Amino acid sequence: MLNRVRSAVAHLVSSGGTSSQRSKSPDLPNATSAPPAAQETPKSSREKPGNQVGAPQKTAETTVSFSRPTFLQLSPGGLRRADDHAGRAVQSPPDTGRRLPWSTGYAEVINAGKSRHNEDQACCEVVYVESRRSRSVTGVSREPSHNQGFCFYYWGLFDGHAGGGAAEMASRLLHRHIREQLKDLVEILKDPLPPPLCLPSTPGTPGAPSPSQLVSPQSCWSPQKEVTHDSLIVGAIENAFHLMDEQMARERRGHQVEGGCCALVVLYLLGKMYVANAGDSRAIIVRNGEIIPMSREFTPETERQRLQLLGFLKPELLGSEFTHLEFPRRVQPKELGQRMLYRDQNMTGWAYKKIEVEDLRFPLVCGEGKKARVMATIGVTRGLGDHNLKVCSSTLSIKPFLSCFPEVRVYDLTQYEHCPDDVLVLGTDGLWDVTNDSEVAATVDRVLSSYEPNDPSRYTALAQALVLGARGIPRDRGWRLPNNKLGSGDDISVFVIPLGGPGSSYS
């Protein structure tokens, strides 16, 4: 039975046209060489980005003008297969002995024709953070020493829309922004004492005080709010998202940073997982059969009150075209003066109000489920980019309603003894649109039970099975699931991270 499950997964992946010719490039590129800077910004679609598999030169056979994650190690032929909407071959890193950190599993597949290329991007890195105080007064870095810093593990999924530029840029630079934000915290995070209230104005100067010698909590006011090390890391991640979004705004014209992207990022640092989500990608932990949600979707429905409050406070953002109020359906002119159900930014329930002329405007939030939209345009309310997004046939900008700040949840790995079958699953909405949490947990149990606990390929096989299960198989009426419902026609990207980590006997 176990062998049949393995062979079935292998057959499905190979029949989809998975690349068999991959380049022999070594392990992941190191992400610690330089901070975010102008020279690291996205290049045009015809140039090769530094942290992506880039487009080959034009040949008589074909021209490929898109990129996939470096760790896939795709050859030019593999890039063409990955870009094939008809075959929709599942792509995973090659089994060459150099695996992703923590034996992480990864799989992806292109959409069924929704966009020209796969607009998802992914990143998996081990990043070293050196304290700013380890630099001399002249700014020259001393010899790196792990006594001066620490490493964090990093995974990121970026689901692009209206083009792949924002997702590609975020996949190459967001972890660098996070590293920059953590540089101020190296000594503080190593110190068991509570964080200081203030930092010195010029870190790294001779004679600068240690973290415990900085401004005393009692020297300013009392009592002081309790600030934990966790909250400092969360703040660093939040600021990094904001700085990444600002960089996209500055450089969107010169570097063709088109569209926007949802971002789902995981950091492993000092024994804890930090899961940051801005968009409609999701993460869950499957632990001993238990499902632990580690994120939530940010859509016009889930953030209705935040959007309505902004529209209420700044009506100029709505122009004369939209109303911040929500009605069960579009108000008709013949209903002027009647009392109709509505709700505003302060309400979770419904009430009646007299319909006025302003209520005839289009609602700021409309639709339900996957069809919910902000200003009749976009179905996500958090993410990076979208600085040029405007309402159709209008000059109204939608960006003010879109937040770049993620929600960050923390999971302490030291509080539970994890077994080889305990995993963190990250997926773009292409997975979750057709697969619920229970189905993912069932797939985790089915696939992992067919492999030995110390087999590192089991997590890649699981990622492939999740992608295949969401994609379905081609039939006369499109891609179909076993129950004959439509499979996902979107790009699908999945990370499977074993929670045992690098120190476990099976990683």
Curated annotation (Swiss-Prot):
Which SMART domains does the entry mention? PP2Cc
Q: Which transformation does this protein catalyse, written as a reaction?
A: O-phospho-L-seryl-[protein] + H2O = L-seryl-[protein] + phosphate; O-phospho-L-threonyl-[protein] + H2O = L-threonyl-[protein] + phosphate
Asked if the record carries the keyword Ribosomal protein, the reply is no
Residue(s) carrying Phosphothreonine: 41
Q: Which domain of life is it from?
A: Eukaryota
Q: Where is the composition biased (Low complexity)?
A: 14-23, 199-212
Q: Which PANTHER family match?
A: PROTEIN PHOSPHATASE 1J, PROTEIN PHOSPHATASE 2C
The record's family statement is: Belongs to the PP2C family.
| Name used for this protein in its record | Protein phosphatase 1J
Organism of derivation = Mus musculus
